[in-house]
Amino acid sequence: MVSKRLQAQNFGDSMSATEPAGGQQERSLGDEIVGRIDELAAVSEAPQHLTRMFLTKQHRAAADLILGWMRSAGMRAHLDAIGNVCGRYEGEAAGSPCLMLGSHYDTVRDAGKWDGPLGLITAISCVAELQKKGRRLPFAVEVIGFADEEGVRFASTLLGSRAVAGTFDERLLGAKDSAGISMRDALSQFGLDPNHIGAAARARGELLGYIELHIEQGPVLEAQGLPVGVVTAIAG
């Protein structure tokens, strides 16, 4: 969990830049992460603020942008049937269990740009560093951008992670948004097959763990002057 104070600073300052032989300073990892967060924040349904709801045109544009970043980082990447953006960087042995990293890429109305993309984009940049250095780990690394956490459009939260956990309730496909469009129809318009959502579920043996870098949405770290904290329990 990253404190508000660290966000308010130039995030790039917290990650050192390197100085190549030619003397021209390379862009730091922090600068790259912040630049991509800004680029993703520009993909919005409203020009005055950030709104990117599940299965909208802007949501699809964001998914395509993230897919491109994953592939540039050396990952095989695809959309699953609920719209999660999934990338995999193989370990030393193909088919190894994975450590999963990521966050969500949908937003609430008038959202903050760090909520979700910080964890997702930082994870992609970490994998890109592994690729750049030619390193493979004893396990695979998977990065996932959950399609829906906020539940704004269909009044049902955590749809992306429910699909991965194997707890997605197919009755939700009949839920309708404010325009009367069902989730099933919205998925089809997005280019996905709602009949295959069950295939997004992951078996326990495939996953070593899940790590998500996230902004602090409270005052504790800021009040104590701490840049980061480790979450040991969560409600919900």
Q: Could you describe each region identified by the protein language model?
A:
Residues Q7-N10:
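Charged/polar low-complexity intrinsically disordered segments
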Residues A17-T56:
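N-terminal capping segment at the start of a domain
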Residues A42-E90:
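A non-catalytic alpha/beta surface segment that caps or lines the substrate-entry region
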Residues A73, V85-L118:
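Catalytic-core environment of secreted peptidases
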Residues A94-L99, R136-V141, G205-L208:
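Short coil/turn connectors at secondary-structure junctions
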Residues L101, A111-E149:
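Alpha-helical metal-binding/catalytic segments enriched in His/Glu/Asp
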Residues D148-E149, R153-G236:
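Midchain, well-structured core segments that form catalytic/ion-binding scaffolds
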